[in-house]
Amino acid sequence: MKTLADYHPVPVYQTPVGFKYIGELIKEDKIVLGGEESAGLSIRGHLPEKDGILACLLVAEAVARRGASVKQQLAALFKKVGAVENVRINLRLEPDVQKRLLAKLQRDWEKFDSRPVRKIDRTDWLKMILDDRAWVLMRPSGTEPVVRVYCEAPTQPELDRLVAAAKAFVFEP
């Protein structure tokens, strides 16, 4: 999202978990488009609630109007703004690991995997921004004994390295 927003240039708002926060931004006319990882999407002027069907219809419309497949359109977009790789993993935690991790997530970190942390965002627990195109976010689930780890990087090898570092961060004492 940020890569695309930077290209246009428009602001990006990161909210806590819950589409209600995105709906509020739409109602306040702060954003035109809002989405979340579960394919929930809303566009100002439509429903201020998440709607996966709208997202699918808009993709179908883009394919029909442009005469190019989704894959072709993504390739063109990535050529313009640069590709990013991302992943979400759930790591199941034993109670002692969970307690230790919660304390670690509340600290401010200057380095992650020997790389400098340029910025910390606490909108949703701990997001460590490493540079313009790489970051790691860790947050405990509110419903099960897992930590959700999100990583983004410009290449697959860098993403794999971030995932390995995140797993080590979670499980190392």
Positions of PLM-derived features:
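Phosphate-binding and adjacent anionic-ligand microenvironments
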Residues: 1-173
